[in-house]
Each structure stands twice: as C-alpha cells, then as structure tokens.
C-alpha cells in the first residue's frame, strides 16, 4: 500500500516542477533550472542568482548530471574558480559514492557559501546559489539579505556517506551526527559518526574574489550522502528552494562538511544534554566571542515593532494598488516571512520529513567561528585556506563560514555586512522525533516556545565531531524580543526523491510562563532560592505585556489579516479531518493492513506496483536509466522487467478524466434567455397563510389547505385471538389508521396495538409515522396485512373502515368455530383409534380375514379418517379418494392415519380396517388436488408453502397431516398412496422442518393389496404404543420373524402376527408377551415427562401391549399384504393396524416426544422428533404400505431389495424384517426398495429410548412382491433393539436368548442381549448375519453393525466383536438370515461408536450395548445401554472422538483408509481393497475424486454408522464400508450388500442399504461416493445398487431399468456415530465403526420409495445439523436422487443431489460442491436443523461423483487407494447432465416440496442433527428440532389449532436459536473439515 504521501508527493512534484519552470529557471546561473521558489506568499519574486565568476562551473555540470538526486542543484555550481577546481575533484570522488536514495535531510544554506572541502566519501556536491532577496533592489548585490538566514539550510554535516552507523541514531531522537548534549564534557563521542574530516566543498568560498557575488554563491552543500540523515528514517531528500519572497535560497547540495557531525550545541549554562544523546563535546566554558553578536549595533531589536511597521507598509501598498487598479489584494499575509527575509533574522529550523522519517530540529552555527580548545578563544577559520584545501579533501578542519550575523542588525547594517555575516551559518540537526511524539509540533501550532528546548535554544555553542576531533562553533542567537522565529521546512508535500524543494513558512514562537520559568531555572541554577524568586519576579515584570486601555479593532484586524493566508485552511474542521491522514494514522492503518492481509493477492499487489513504476524511456541500455526506471542493475533482469512492464497495461489515466477545479466563473456559453419566462404562469400561487380568506377566518374547513391537522382517510382493524395466561384467550387488536394532511397531501400512518383488547378500554400503545404518497401507504397496508395474517394462514378478522362507508369485514385462516369442529373430529378419531387398538389386539390373535374385506373396511375407515383428518389436517380429501382406490390406496393412507392428531395418541389409532389417512388416492388427479388444498391450507398456517409434486401418474398422491400430541409434539404424517406409476410424488411435508414423503413405488403400486399396508401401520402403532417394550419385542420378534418370516412369506400373516406377538412379549418382558411393568413404568414416566395426558399414557400402555402383539402383527402385516392384516391382527385386524399404528405413534410421541425423532421408515414413513425427552416432538410418520398383497416381506425387502429374483426377496424380506428393525432404529430415513408396504420406524427416547422401530415395509421390488406377499418383514423396535442389542440372539437364532436388557435410560432401548458378548454368540450372530447374506439372495439384507473394531471391516470382523468368520455367517440358515443380518447389524451397532474402533474389538456385548444404548438413548443417553464400556455419557465423547479421528486420520486419502476407521480399523482397508478389487474386476469405480471428508462429515452425523455396504448388483460381493473410529471401512461382502448402520447409544437410525436390483439392472446402479477425507463421515454410502434407488449413503445406485431399488439411509438420530454396516453374504457383516457425530446419509431409492420417503431421507439428512440434506426429487420411480447429507455439526456431508434416472448408465452423485454451485440444496451446516432452505443451499460436498453412463455395463470399483469416483467408461459430464436435469426436476420438485418442506427436511434431519448435536447438545437440539418440527409442521398439518401454531412458532424459534448457537460452536470444526 502506498502511503498517502506518495500520491500527494507526485502531484506536488509536478506542480513544483511547473513552478520551477515558470519561475525563472531561465537564469544562466541556474543551469539546471534550479528554480528559486518564492517562499511564502508575499511577493514571489524570483531572483536570479548570478554567479560572479563567469567560469562558474560548466565543467562541473556533467558530473552533476550524474547526481540523480539533485541534478539541478548540482549544476548550479560555484561561481568561483576555486570552487570549480574543488568541485571537480569533489564531484568526481562523490559521484560513485552517491547513494541511490536522496539525502534524507538536506538543508540549503542559501546564504552561506559552503567552503568545506568535500570529503571523498562524504563529498557532497556543493551548489552555491546566491539568492538575492526579493526585497533588495539589487539582485546581484551580495547583500546579506540574499543569504537570508531563513532560507539557509545548512547541509547536514551529518550527512556522512556511511549511513549505516548513523541510522540507529537517526531512529533515536537525536540525529546521529549531532551531539546535542549540551553538557560541557566534550567527548569524542561525536567521532562515532564517521571519521570524515568535515569536508565542505570549498566551492564558493571566495571572500576575496567577486566579493559580494561570491558570497552570494553560498554553495549549500547538501549532503548527497544519505548517511546520517539519509538513513531511511530521516531527512527528506529535498532541498528547499528558497521561494521567492526575498529569500531564494539556492539549495546547493551542501556536502555536509561536518560529516563527522556529532554536533552538540553547547549551552553556556550547563544545559543537560537534553538535546541529544550524541557526544557531549560542547565546551560550555568557552563563550562565543562578542563577535557572535557581531553587529556593531547594540540597539534592541524590537521584533514586534518591525512586524507592525512592515505590516503597515504592506497595507499602504495594497491600498495604493487598490486605488490604482480597483483590485483588492492581501500581500500582508506573510509579514513575518518578509521580515525574516529582509532582516536576515536567525531562525531555528524544523524539518518535517515525509513518511515515518519524523521531524527534526536543526540549529544554525557559525562555521567561521571555531573555539580554540587551547586558548578557549574564538578564532575565525580562513575561507581561503579551506578553498586551497579543495584538492585535499577532508583536510580543512571545518568549513569556514562568514561570521554569524549579529543578533539584531539594522537592515543597513545587514546590508553593509555584505554577505559575510549571515549567509555563512551552517545548519546542524540536533534532535529528531517520530510524529507520534508531537510535543514540539503542538508548541508550534500554539505559537509557544517549547520550554523543554529552552536550554538548546539559549546555548551559545555547537560542537561537531568528526574523525579529526570535536570542534566547537559559535551559535548565533535566535531570540528577538524574547521570541524565536521557527522556520518550518515541510518536505512532506514535495517529491522528495527528485528535488530538495520544501515548503517553508515561518512562525513566531512567543514565550510563555513555562519558558520563563525554564529560563529562571537556567540562569539561576547557581543562585539560592531567594535570589531565584527575585530574579523570577523581575523577569515577570519585564516581560509582562503592557496593558491596553484603549481597545482598538484594528489590532484584531491586523492580527487576522497577517495570518489570513496561513489560516485559510486551518479551521478546526479541516484539522480534525486531516488527523485521518497524519503519519501516525497511516502507520496504524499499515499495521492493520499488515495483520489483516488477504493472502493470495500478492500478484495483484505486484502488478499494481509495476504499473506505478515509471516507464523506461529511450534509455534502453539502462546506462542512463535512473534508478527509478531501472530497478535492477542486471541488464538481463532489467530487460525482462521492462518487457514485462510494457505488456502490463497501465491504469487508464487517459480514460479517467481529471477533476477540473471548481471555478466561480460563469460558463462561457451561458446567456440570458431571450424572452422572460413568466414564472407566475407555471407556479401555483398560495395565499399567505396569515391572511386567511373570509371562509377561513372562523376556522378552516376540514379539507382546507390551511388545515395542518391530518384527516382520517381509512382504518383497518385486525383482530385475532392469542393465548393469554391461565388458558384465557385474549383478543389481539391492531388498528391501522391512515391519515392525510390536507396542506401537503402527505399520508401519515398511526398504528395502535392492544394485546389484550377490551371494549371501551384503550390499554395499548400507538405510534405515528410518515408514509408519504398513496403508493407507499397502500404498500404498507398490504405488507402489514400479510405479516400479521401470516399471508392468510392465521385466523384474523380484518375490518376495513372508510369514513362515510359501510365497514368491510374479511376473515383469514381458520376461525374458532372451524377449530372447534376440527378438535371434535380429532377427538372422534382418537376414540375410534382406541376402538381400533382394541380390535387390533383381538385381530392379532385372529388370522387375517380376507384381505379384501379388511381393505374395504379400511377404505371405509379411511374415508372416515380422511374426513376427520381433513378437519385435523386442513381437509384431507385424499383419503376419500383413496378409499375409492381400495387396497393400494389403503396402503398409502397409512401415512394419513399417522397424520391424525397424535395429540391423543391412543385416540388416533383408528379402527384397524380404517387407515385414517392411509387410503391411497385412487385417482391421482383428485388426490393431488386435495393434497394441494391441504398443502395450501397448511402453507397458510405455517408460512411454509408445500407444493406437492405430482411427478408420477395422477394416481400417486400424498397427503400430509399434522397431528399435535398432548405432549406438545407434532406428528406429521404424510400419506402416500402407492401408485402403479413409478413416479413418486415428492411431497415434502414441512412439519417443524421435517419433510415426510411417503414413498410410492411402482412395486408398491404393483402390490395392490393394502393388507400389507395395514400391517405396517399396525406395527408402527404397536411400536408407538409401547415405547421401550417395542424395542425388546422387536429384538425378539425379529428373531422370531427371521424364522417366521420365511413361514410368513409362505403362510398368511397369522404367523407374522404370532411372531409379532412373541416379539412384543419379548420386548415387554424380554420373553413375556405382556409389557414389562418396569417398561410400563418407564413409559408412564416418559409420558408424564412429556406432559401427556394420563389417558394417553394409559392408551400408550394399552398400545404397548397391542404393539407388542400389534407391532409384530403390524410388521407382519406390512410384510405380507394379505396375511399382514391378520398378522397385525394379533393386536388388531389388518384394518385395525392402522388404528393401532396411529395409537402406537401417539403413544410413542406422547411417551417420548423427543424420542421419536428422525426415525425414517423404510417405507415412506418417517418420524422425526429431535428432542427425545422434550415434550414437544414432531413425529413424521409416513406409512406407505405398498398395496402388493403378498409383499409383507417387501418392507424387509425394502431394506434388502433382492438383487435377484423374487425368491431371493422372500428370504431377503425375512432378513429385511430384522434389518428393517435396525434401519428403523438407526436410520432416520429408510426407503422401501420394493413395491411392498413400507413401515415406519419410530424411535422414541422417552428417556432417550428408542420407542418405535420401523414398521414393516410391505413394499418390495416387484420381484420381491412376487416372492412372498405373505412374508412380513416386521421391523419392530423390539426386534430391532434385540438384534442390535444381542446380535447373536437376534440374528440367526430367534430362539437364541435375546435378553432384552433395557438400558437404564430407556426400558425399551436395551432390548438386546448384552449377554451375547461371548465369542460364540458373536459367531452365532455373525453366522446368522452371514447366513442371511449368503443363503439369502444378494438382496438379503445383512444388517451387520460391525463393531468399530479395526477388524470390523473384515468379513469375520473379529475385532468388531463379530468374531464370527464368514463361514459362520454362511452357515447360518437363510431363513434366519434376515434375523441374522439384523443381529449382525445390531452386534456391530452394539459396539458403541463412542468407544470407537478401539472398543469395537470388544466383545459383542459391547456392540449390543452400543446398539442398546443407541436404542435406549436416541439422544444423549447412549451410555445408558447395558454396554459395559459405555457410561451413559460416553456416546457424546465418542462422537466427538470420532470426529477428531476423522479429521486427523491420514487414511482419508485412500478409500480403505477412509473406509476403515482411521484408528483401530487398519484391517478394514485391506478388506476394502479386496472388496474394491472384486468390484474392480467388473467395473472401475474410482472414488479418488470423492472427498471422504465430506462423507465423513455426513457419516459423522450418524453416530452409530459403522458399516456401509455397497453392493453393485453385478457383483456378487458387496463392498462394505465400515465407519469405525469415524472412518469408513469397506468390507468385502458376499453377494448381498447390506448396509446396517446402528447408531451408538445416541444413534437413532441404522443405515441399511439393501441392494435390491432386479437381475436386469444389478450392475449399473450403484455408485459409492466416498469423501476423500476418510474421517468419520465416510459413510461410504452403503452402496447398494438399487436399480432405481440410489443407496442412501453416498452410494448412488443407478438402477438401469429394474423397478425395484434400494434405499440406503444412514441416519444417526443420536449424536453418537451411526454405523452403517453393510455386509454381504460372503463377507462379515458391516464393519461398523462409530460414525461421525450426527449425520445421516440417506439415499433413498426414489423409484421404490414413495416420494415422501425419499424426501424424508434427504430432508432428514438436511436436517442434520451441519450438512446439506439430500434432496431427492421424486419424479419417476426410475429417477434416483442421491443426496448425501453433509455432515451435521462438524463435517460437511457429501451431498448427493439430483435424481438418478432409471437408466442404469446415469449415475449421478452430486457432490456437495456441485450442489453448492447449483445452490440447489441449502447446507444445513450453518443453518443447523432449523433451516428450511435445503433445496436452495449449495451442499458442501467436496466432490461431485458422477458415474459414467457406462456404469450399467461396467461395475463400479472403489479403488482402495483414493476415494475418487471415476466412471470408467461413460463420460461423467454426460451422466451428470441427465442427472443434473433429473436433479433439476427433482430439485424443482424438491424445491417445491422441500422449500415448502425445507423446514420439514431440516427437521427430519434434525434427529440426525440431534445426533450430531446430541453429542454436544443432543437433548437441546432434539428439543429444538422437535419444536422446530412442530413449528414447521404447522403448515403441513392441515388442521392445526391456533394454539398449536403458537406453540410451534415458539418451539421453532427456540430451536433455531439453539441451532444457531450449535452452528456457531461447530463452525470451527466445520471449517477444519
């Protein structure tokens, strides 16, 4: 940065240059055109100095030209021949020595010809210039005036050629050369400066020759040597050119003859060396001879009289001039300058240097009067001698100067003195200060004598030291009438490098009391105190000014005029402004810039400097080039630079026109108009206001112009009800009055606000404000109405009053009557739900009656429910339409059922036959319309606009309902009716920011029967009903289910019901069907804590029993379409299931409002409640039951969508049930791969417990549907918990004891056997898991939570705590496989992610505990699990630890390293490599491009995510990624890749990626993205290749054509890491390393999963704290959107955005970066869970992975070395383009849905966010997120009471604040990632 000075200097330089030329540079004497600058204003007379000797110095000139700095000055050379000869030698010697930089301080001594011989080193060019004062008539005359002392700038004798020694001194206050110490001791210290004999070029010292003339040529030898003063700090290199006033000081560069120059001014009195630190070589004793005051004239020189006389003289001149010319001029402004110039008065010199060189004080001394140390007498030095010494440089001891002029000389005397006297004075700098030390400057500003310098000023001698010793010179007196004249030489505004010109002005420093006191102290230093007082009194009397008894204004006028010119710009305002540009301010700014430097702009700065360099002129050789133009001496470099600079365009000065100075002259072309314009014609005449017309005398009319009182124009009264204290409803009354002032037609507004309005009372507050024009008033009215009514969503009564008209009343939003109706309907629904629950319990025992009958019942019920819901959730018309659709529609309507008010959870359960909102919409168009209506209503309520995307056929539609639970949690239910069309409506319901999209899949559509749907709902209800028991039951049920699923697939749902019942019993009692009393007590306490009604609690208990039976049944029902109803019948008939699921959801919500958070159902159902323990929970439950009658297992299939044929599906489905449980628990988002019914998982942490598990996802791929419709995959929380807790028990041996040990925190959560820790058990579990994978078709889901152990990635994953080798896994029977997979997943999950990979080695107990913890504590209570290592709080540390490990783990660079947990999972990487190798054989998928760090961020969000399996359909072996220790590990998997992520105690969702690819499309779909930073979040996305569904994680599966797809959702509800373990049949179950803190990557399979589900997953991801969400636009089933969620808190998750089209070739993984570029997705990172803008925010995914279109043909291989996703054959761009297009479409849907549901998505993620935050702030965030969900859900739920809205708003605000706080905390970690 160039200092401000430089620019000013350039400009001033140009100005000075022109002035020089104008001012008589023509003088022959000034060969160089040394311009005499008239100093001061006065009369600027340029006096040409004529050098007496004609031969003056032509010869010298060429030499001078070399001197770059002062060529002009140098060339004016010495007139005397003697000077010539001297100069030649001195110049020749000096030229090589001249430093490139100008002498820092150059004092021009105009008057004194400097004789000093120039020392070779110090030789300075001496340029004598004799300036004849303008005042003198004879310019040539050598009158002393020409050497005005004012102008004399003594060359620094300091200027010593060797700058280095001097520099430090310069930095000190004293100039190095000057020994300012006045102390008598004359020490040789001065000699320090440089040992050069003071050589003053004896140039013009011709006393004899030319007499006066020679005297005039005072060659001021200015030091060209920069040394002392030249040192960077110091003096300006400018020579002052004496300005005309009479002082032309020829500034000759005076060779500082006294280079040694330690100058000490000796004060006769012992002045302490105040002046300087230098040598104190002043002999105080020697008194300067009287000759110092040599004027013969002893007469007192009255300075004030002289000034006054001169002023009057100038005044008379001005008056005469005015009389002659009529022009006024003020020539008397510079009276003092004129006087000094005329009288040649002695001055002190203050040099102001540019930049940081500071300012200095310089004193004159008489070079010709030297004190002889022996005799102690003054001896004049002979000038001639020194001149003769010219040849011998340095011989002369001192340059002789003519004696100092007497202090007060008359003009006549001064003239007579001829130049001898004054001009001889040398000048020496004695002190130097930085500008920060401005004491002297302040004194000068105040025109006061500086008392602290009095000793210096009074001193009579100056001692200078050089190599030869110290010489003491006489110092002329500077006092006149007690005042001192200071000559200010300002070098700051001139261009220092080129000239020695300075601006000079003179200031009269007057004595003050302080100086008087200082003098007394000095004079009376030896006197006693009494004498001192007497002396002081006399001095005070003598110096007191006379009293003026006749005041005269002329005195003031004279003072003003004499200062006029100087004070022009000296106003206080200007001075204040100038402080910004003082050197201190500039230094401060430079320092600031230095430390706030923006790195990376160095090149820009360099180019700027280059442009500022002057162009090299014709001197190409550089010989002539000045240093400025030739920056370097190297010709090569110079040539390069010049060629370069010529190419660098300079700033277009030509383009920028200079600003013309303003002129007061009229423009030349301005002329008076020819004809006068009649102003009156156009102006409007107003009669004067004081002369009112007759009509206005008595009083103005209302509209009279004189009336300044505003008149009322119109009024708006807005009234609404608000909740007041004690449940009282207060009237919120706002009156907006619009006034208009008749006088100026201005509109005014008045706003009156009364928050508790009562008729006739005015308790509110009002304010008035100006509106201006009518347009502004209208705009204000419109905006105010929109804001107050929340754009019409809020119920507000608006009354519009216009004087003289009838009032107009309008209403917005829901009125109280409507609200009451809705409430009544909700109550009815709740009652029905209770009935249904009872029926369901009965039905569970009963075999499923004909599915059709139940479906018809359900349809009827759905109609009823829909009607009821319509009241609850802004009119749900869809259910009616759905009823028409029958079974398929019913499946879809499950979501609606959940949507029913969950405030009364039990009541919400509808009759099993009636799926309240489940009935799928038969007619898409009709459904879409109601949905839109509902959405619009919801939007109005919430401010959030939900736009439903009907991408699929009109048949598919989703309805969303918000149900508010008694505990204050909102449940958002989205109904998605499975449509035959593959398109999935992407409806994002925004409930408190949670988006639930029911997934409609072609497969689901194909599954026409709704019984499976009913089953799923019932399971959900059961789970909801029994919080903890559900987990336990599910754990056991899954065991049973695994065994029974096969049976169920073959048999009716009855077996499923039995299994469910068993599972439920297991959950409640570990083994008993009935709920555990302890569990019930926990549930009760949870419900109480949630502020739920006791009724709800009772209902929940009932529901828990029902769910225990009913969950199993519901799961079974979901699994089997026909039989599923019967299965659910264990609690109720299939139709009953709906009710039961509602009741269960209600129970779940009520029991643990926060616990529900972020449990996505594999089907579209997603429940998110972030705050497990918080009463306000928004639970989004999407029940998508796929209508396929037989795909009860489809839900499980959803998990594991069989890559192979349907038969595979059946086994897979069984596995899926177990895996579903895991998914439900662990995955916030789960998508159903198949067309089967989908079930929702609810995980509620009443006390941090997981209460609800995913319901069975009935929907499976079509293949799956064909395989076993009857098979129900029941994912019950109990089963899931059991599996997670005790993998061995859950996995293969349903009979194996699953001791459901509920962790202390949550009764249900610890349903798993922690006993299983033993290796054999682990082996069993592994074997079961492996069995699942091996026996089951690749589709079979192996949900293996690999313990985070280093070995976890290995197939055996022994370290994981799966000690079971692959053999064991294969040994387990296929039938048990599903259970085994779950158990494996659970086992892995069981290893607490917090414990990290290290703990993962610990036995299964560990894993079980982790899973249990996860289950039990969704939020922060992970440790509560019985896991031995885990303390309840460990999960948080674990998460943090994971995050750290990810960040630090070096493994990130290579896939396996990232895949393997960086810490303990080294083994993982080899397995990864193997897997990669296996995959590589078929396809090359290079993951290097992928940035694992982002994945890690996403993974980190999933606390429990440990193993993610990526299965490429074409490959027999899936790739399993283990995230343990925060890293992904790839495990070689058998043919099936199952990703089971189990969150640690905190983790809420398990990522299960089941590759379901139709055999057709197995290869093409899967792309696994790994972020390069392997750290915790590499969830390497489970890559399950699903033909149409991208795997949830970073895996993008591109199903080429197969309708069946998988969704992999890695969700971490709890802060604890989620591990997504995907194990293939061949390989060990997932290697689950603990995942990143909280992130869920959900890559739903868009096609299979209903749009709602897909949306839920991405949204869930989005809601994760940090990360952008995965936005999946659901367009066609085939289209797949992959969004990976950017890591919640700490890490950016990989955002996979965009839909992957069904074409197998298109694999798009859009990295977060691309997303960010597109700004399609909002990253939740900053927003945290609270932001709605998910769609718009760019996701920070470091890499976009696009798999080439060839993916279908070529398998994707993850290279172990780098995580880059390379598509081997297909161009990435092509793929990206279609994908982008799809993404754009999806994103458009998403943006419609997400923006409306953006809030929803963020809340869906919030549970992951909670997971992330959970570690840090799990509970807070969950609460916030719940609140947020509730707040956002308001619009989504069609009917929300005003109270709910307010509660939601409050919750949302709270959450946002907390989220913001969390985000702030996380920002640093995010940045690091």
Swiss-Prot record:
Which compartment or compartments is the protein found in? Nucleus
An example GO BP is:
regulation of transcription by RNA polymerase II
Q: Which domain of life is it from?
A: Eukaryota
Q: Which InterPro entries match?
A: Spt20, Spt20-like_SEP
Q: Does the keyword Heme apply?
A: no
Is Transcription regulation one of the keywords?
Answer: yes
The protein's UniProt keywords, in alphabetical order, are:
Nucleus, Transcription, Transcription regulation
Q: Give the Gene Ontology MF terms in alphabetical order.
A: transcription coregulator activity
A single GO CC term, please? SAGA complex
Q: According to its UniProt record, which protein family does this protein belong to?
A: Belongs to the SPT20 family.
How it assembles, according to the record, is: Component of the Spt-Ada-Gcn5 acetyltransferase (SAGA) complex consisting of wda/Taf5L, Saf6, Taf9, Taf10b, Taf12, Ada1, Spt3, Spt7, Spt20, Sf3b3, Sf3b5, Nipped-A/Tra1, a histone acetyltransferase (HAT) module made up of Gcn5, Ada2b (Isoform B), Ada3 and Sgf29, and a deubiquitinase (DUB) module made up of not/nonstop, Sgf11 and e(y)2 tethered to SAGA by Atxn7.
Cited function = Component of the transcription regulatory complex SAGA, a multiprotein complex that activates transcription by remodeling chromatin and mediating histone acetylation and deubiquitination. The SAGA complex predominantly acetylates histone H3.
This protein is called what? SAGA complex subunit Spt20
The organism that produces this protein has a lineage beginning with: Eukaryota, Metazoa, Ecdysozoa, Arthropoda, Hexapoda
